[in-house]
Amino acid sequence: MVTPWRLSVRVCLSHLRCFEFRKELGHSRPLGCSRNARLCWFLLGTLPKLISAHGSVGEGAPGSLCQRKTHWSDLAENGLVEKVAQEGPLARVLLCLRLGLRAGVLLAKFFPLLFLYPLTYLAPGLSTLWLHLLFKATETSGPTYIKLGQWASTRRDLFSEAFCTQFSKLHVQVTPHPWARTEYLLQQAFGEDWGSLLFFETREPVGSGCVAQVYKAFASISLLEEDRIWRLGELSAPGTRAVVMQREPFMKDRKPSENLADEAFLEKLLLPKADLGGSEVGVSQAPWHLPKSDHLIPVAVKVLHPGLLSQVSMDLLLMKIGSKALGLLPGVKWLSLPEIVEEFEKLMVQQTDLRYEAQNLEHFQHNFQDMASVKFPTPLRPLITRDILVETYEESVPVSSYQQAGIPTDLKRKIAQLGINMLLKMIFVDNFVHGDLHPGNILVQGADGVSPSLEMQQQQVNVCDTLVATIAPALCPLRLVLLDAGIVAKLQASDLRNFRAVFQAVVMGQGHRVAELMLHHAQANECRDVERFKAEMATLVTQARKNIVTLEKLHVSSLLSSVFKLLMTHKVKLESNFASIVVAIMVLEGLGRSLDPTLDILEAAKPFLFKGPASFL
């Protein structure tokens, strides 16, 4: 809230705002004035903005210059309605108009499908057509509904197998937003001379999803020691102003903090570069001009689409209203739709704040620091804001490229085994699972350098002295690279024990035990015939293992798919993270068996299930 004295200062000095255009006009100050006079001149034009926009003048002010006035935390904690209510009646009227227009568009797309749904019971072909139309309607309804469709495809305990299979393909390449928007966000986050930090060879993104688009660029290592970079640390962690940075290997000594009492800092902050004739800071380079390559590292720059927060918050508000209305229907009451929307809202909060993804990447790097076969991009912690994520660019090949014919069988088998070991470690050792493990987010490095002698050398190095492996990059070990860590799943300690017990029961063929554990873990259920549910689960597990000589012939993904179908039939609803981890197992096993048909995930899981996670380490 702006206090009266700040308001008076802003009003009295509002005519000085024309100094914003001092660079272009060139006559905002007399030529030839002294250094102190020039500094005072620009302070008069800029200081009122600092005071009116921020609560105080001190060390915190410069760092907060890059922050946006409207934060997602405000929408998440206070709600869109409460926030608009504080802005006056006109804002409320505009919100109602926008909500009405958005609701009208969504009704025009989805209400005819709801009206036609009874026809799907007449013929399987009509059901397939209806699902296709629903897919297209979701695909064109914006990022919130695209993410909702992707998330719903993981809830096989709630939706049919055909629905989940169809919507698991919902990975949309949207039209990228203009370069001008990206340039605006870069300038807002890193200052007008952002071109001295990031260098773009092209303005065209390498990919554009429903939430953000990604550019390939180069980051200057030498300039990461600039004083202003330390102030960017305030934007690098959600909910905190602490500067959390990875200094090594990029930074050595931290320079002292600067504040508004430092005259040199004020001049550097407020004056245009043309006025700093004697300064060591030069004119910023054009974004597409590359200096010497030995001072650069390739990076991926992820930028959120414009207007994303506003659209997502509005769609979530409509979803909450719709879920409460649909929750009154007897047939869907057991789904607890308002709770589902709340779970999805948490997911969208993380998707629309790239600092969460940076935290997840660092968490994964810590978990896999002793496992050279799995790698994650390194977020450049100073260059991270709510809207922009800068991370190392990993030159890799998509894992789907190795599903083709002509790839050596041994290489396919090694890649499949790496993927299964990676997933089992995430689940049973770390309890921190990547929540979006589709083939597009899994890449392969070092496949060209794999040979029997190399593999033997790697094993010897890993056993005797891991430090040797880290200083011998010529070995180029085979490893997986995982991208897009914005969604993760983790279980409570009791839930993890229950999850391990479920897998133990599957291995032992104890169908009744599987049913009991599922019922015990269910978030909500309306199972009216518990004994029948247990009997059908026992039959399901027994039939899956019937006439199977070895467990490697058992397709866990097919078994789990049947389990989900049974859960949906008896209205047993699992906790969302529990379901997400099960789906991750199904996806990885399907991918692994496409590379190695003899892959045995249950055999690989035995050390985790019966000996505990310590046996893996």
UniProtKB/Swiss-Prot annotation:
Protein name, per record: Uncharacterized aarF domain-containing protein kinase 2
SUPFAM superfamilies listed in its UniProt record: Protein kinase-like (PK-like) (SSF56112)
Domain Protein kinase: 200-609
Molecular function, one GO term: ATP binding
Keyword annotations: ATP-binding, Kinase, Membrane, Mitochondrion, Nucleotide-binding, Serine/threonine-protein kinase, Transferase, Transmembrane, Transmembrane helix
Record keyword Kinase present: yes
Organism: Mus musculus
Gene: Adck2
The enzyme's E.C. designation: 2.7.11.-
Coarse class of the protein's main subcellular location: mitochondrion
Protein's UniProt keywords contain Ribosomal protein: no
InterPro entries named among the record's database cross-references: ABC1_dom (IPR004147), ADCK2_dom (IPR044095), ADCK_kinase (IPR052402), Kinase-like_dom_sf (IPR011009)
Source species taxonomy: Eukaryota, Metazoa, Chordata, Craniata, Vertebrata
GO cellular component: membrane; mitochondrion
Function: The function of this protein is not yet clear. It is not known if it has protein kinase activity and what type of substrate it would phosphorylate (Ser, Thr or Tyr). Involved in the mitochondrial import of CoQ precursors, plays a role in muscle mitochondrial function and fatty acid beta-oxidation.
Subcellular location: Mitochondrion; Membrane
Top EC class for this record: transferase
